[in-house]
């Protein structure tokens, strides 16, 4: 399975073009792209710019990917660096979606921030959590408050392992009690698939299972499930005959574009946007 994982650095189109160029350096000479599909935040932009065959909303792509690993999936928990969402599945279709509405400070990226502040890589910081004896209780509050709690715990002699485990618990508690707003973890479902880059952290996965009492499925491609789902959709919609509408690599190499900044007039905030 080919994958390309990168921050978009504020330009999803430029990053996508970089990924496609990388794909073509690895494609066998007798292979070609016959169907394409975009998903996620830049779905419409990428589809239009590169003339892709399809585009699909992120929730549907996540469902396709989750169902590949568990055909009976009835709940998908997705925790990324900046957002978290819960997708409930009913009768093999997306029934409801809940996500963090404004603040992203309780999402996965704050574990990375804390790890760096303690001079640990994310991977080593996560491993420490697995050997915690007394995880500190950080609750479900904002990162600003957690910072002060962590500093206080350090003053009181808390081990790095206990801090890391406490943060892993906190991410899950934020997802369950602040975003999904459940009172009984049993309401989540019986076939749960967890995904998003944050779940590469074994401590976060274990925290989820301990809090909910449910054994979840975590695919080994947890961080790219949206893209994997889009690939499955493209394969399903291919008729086996038609040529892809996607721009050829030569045309992609020749593609030029410009960006301008303006203010969105969709509401009274008049936010600055790039076009």
Segments from the language model and where they lie:
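Adenine-nucleotide phosphate-binding core of ATP-dependent small-molecule kinases
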Residues: 148-177
């Amino acid at each position: 399975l080919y994958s390309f994982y990168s921050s978009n650095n504020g330009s999803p189109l430029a990053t996508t073009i970089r990924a496609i160029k990388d794909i073509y350096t690895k494609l066998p000479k007798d292979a070609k792209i016959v169907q394409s599909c975009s998903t996620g935040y830049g779905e419409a932009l990428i589809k239009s710019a590169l003339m892709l065959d399809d585009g699909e909303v992120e929730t549907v792509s996540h469902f396709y990917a989750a169902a590949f690993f568990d055909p009976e999936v009835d709940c998908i928990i997705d925790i990324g660096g900046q957002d978290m969402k819960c997708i409930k599945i009913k009768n093999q279709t997306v029934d409801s979606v809940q996500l963090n509405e404004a603040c992203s400070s309780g999402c996965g990226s704050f574990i990375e921030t804390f790890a760096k502040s303690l001079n640990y890589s994310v991977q080593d910081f996560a491993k420490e959590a697995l050997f915690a004896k007394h995880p500190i209780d950080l609750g479900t509050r904002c990162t600003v408050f957690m910072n002060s709690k962590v500093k206080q715990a350090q003053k009181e002699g808390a081990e790095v392992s206990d801090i890391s485990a406490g943060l892993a618990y906190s991410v899950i508690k934020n997802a369950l009690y602040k975003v999904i707003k459940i009172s009984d973890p049993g309401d989540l479902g019986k076939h749960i698939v967890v995904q998003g880059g944050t779940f590469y952290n074994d401590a976060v996965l274990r925290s989820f299972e301990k809090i909910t009492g449910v054994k979840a499925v975590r695919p080994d491609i947890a961080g790219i499930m949206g893209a994997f789902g889009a690939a499955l959709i493209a394969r399903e919609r291919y008729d086996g005959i038609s040529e892809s509408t996607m721009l050829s690599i030569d045309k992609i190499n020749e593609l030029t574009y410009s960006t301008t900044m303006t203010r969105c007039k969709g509401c009274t905030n008049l936010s600055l946007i790039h076009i």
